[in-house]
Regions:
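Sparse, context-dependent recognition of short Cys/His-centered cofactor- or disulfide-binding micro-motifs
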Residues: 2, 58, 75, 150, ...
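Active-site beta->alpha N-cap acidic-glycine motif
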Residues: 14-93, 97-98, 108, 116, ...
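Sec-dependent N-terminal signal peptides of Gram-positive bacterial secreted proteins and lipoproteins
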Residues: 1-16
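Serine/threonine-rich low-complexity intrinsically disordered regions
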Residues: 1, 40, 176-179
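Catalytic domains of cell-wall/extracellular-matrix polysaccharide-remodeling enzymes
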Residues: 64, 88-197, 202-207
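Short non-domain terminal segments
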Residues: 2, 29, 54-55, 194-196
Length: 207
């Protein structure tokens, strides 16, 4: 009888292991340098189709020119971040000018969408911690650089990203190229199939 109970317990435990829900791994898709008058909208269509949230780090000079695309990003529920006004290395500027590069974008985003932004991606990944304290902005870098701006080879972009992907990674892309739109769609599908859950960067860095 004791042996029978032991076997039953083992079978129940094994069944529980097989039926348990697999844990999802969070990953964030981010886009720099937008908005683009054509490819931002194409990217938004892909994200809507795949039901995936993303984070867009906008350049002020582009956001000013393509305000409708900024509103579309916000209306679809994506997170908007700051990428300075002119894509400049903030540490190369006088403090006041560096501050204005960031504040001007935040002000414009709030004007266009009704909400400001707390997140900044410094161009070239170079940041000044003093700006973080003074402007109360949270810098967001990346862990996977797709290098999508260097090639139109969609396969190369996809394979590099999927091979490097891990839990809580932040993927850097640019919504300025047709090849990036195509690659993003395939990356999303591949990583979903591997059990990844796409989230906005705030859910990764605050995890």
């Amino acid at each position: 009888m004791e042996k029978f109970l032991t076997v039953c317990a083992a079978l129940i435990l094994t069944a529980g292991m097989w039926s348990a829900e697999p844990e999802t791994r969070k990953i964030a898709l981010t886009f720099d340098d937008g908005p683009h008058p054509v490819y931002t909208e194409e990217m938004l269509k892909v994200l809507e189709q795949e039901q995936v949230p993303a984070t867009f780090f906008l350049l002020g000079e582009n956001a000013e020119q393509y305000g409708e695309q900024v509103r579309m990003i916000a209306e679809q529920g994506h997170l908007i971040g700051n990428h300075t006004w002119r894509h400049v290395q903030v540490t190369s500027l006088p403090k006041e000018e560096a501050e204005e590069e960031i504040l001007a974008v935040s002000s414009l985003v709030e004007e266009l969408t009704g909400n400001g932004t707390s997140y900044v991606r410094p161009p070239f990944g170079i940041w000044d911690p003093e700006l973080e304290e003074k402007l109360d902005m949270i810098p967001v870098l990346w862990t996977i650089d797709t290098l999508d701006w260097t090639t139109q080879n969609v396969d190369r972009i996809v394979e590099k990203t999927v091979q490097d992907a891990g839990e809580n990674d932040i993927i850097l892309m640019h919504d300025s190229y047709e090849s990036t739109v195509q690659a993003a769609e395939r990356i999303i599908r591949r990583l979903k199939a591997e059990g990844f859950e796409f989230v906005t960067v705030d859910q990764v860095i605050m995890d």
